[in-house]
């Protein structure tokens, strides 16, 4: 079990030493600015684990940064922090030592909490707009159940039970609900649909991990036979494993066997961002505004998909 712990300032300071690895994994440039000839303007991101993925080949944010930088050669975007949403928020609240400019969370509640309870830490992302704009929605995700046994049909077993079955699987991996919105969604499914007794942190059937990527890794490593993960982790060019394979999508609302009766699995996983107060040059503020506009361009057919819509579809997200 992983207990939910707030990081100390010392731990956050230690994270500065490894922050360059986040940027390297995201495949982006350094900490440029608009000062000096030939230097590029840069902004720093903190990104929730599900949207960070596993760069460079399976990462929604890396794809988006590459598209944005290709269209804007004077700009760079660097991921300096990634992890569970609550962990990233804690880093920002406790000094923002990684100098984050934009926080992309896996929920709407955390950016809203920063806006209401830590207003001195946030900034409008479009200063010319009246009234000022602070938070914005950029994606909606989906929860999925994943097995580490190829060929396992999670849609229905021989007894007719579909999806997760506490009588069949010794343990199930989830992200820590106190830290990760996808963990909250998994908790809602396990308690509300499968009648597991709370608190899940002390339930021997449940293994909690510090973020959704760690839960996915636990299933792949066969630490747990199944786990609730983000759909984006198992999505390939807009398609996810279908019935008869080792994964099953859990949408927030599903049809049931009873006509006109819906199953409410969890609250929709709408993901929001918020600009963080930092010492930025006018050029960096302009870049920040441009990047938010890029992330919120949901243009789709009949006109060609925007880069944002192309990326959302590729990783099985939808527009919020």
Indicate residue ranges for each PLM-predicted region.
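Bacterial N-terminal signal peptides that target proteins for export
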Residues: 1-11
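Exported/periplasmic ABC-transporter solute-binding proteins
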Residues: 27-94, 105-122, 131-320
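Serine-hydrolase catalytic machinery in alpha/beta-hydrolase-like enzymes
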Residues: 126-128
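Bacterial N-terminal signal peptides
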Residues: 10-20
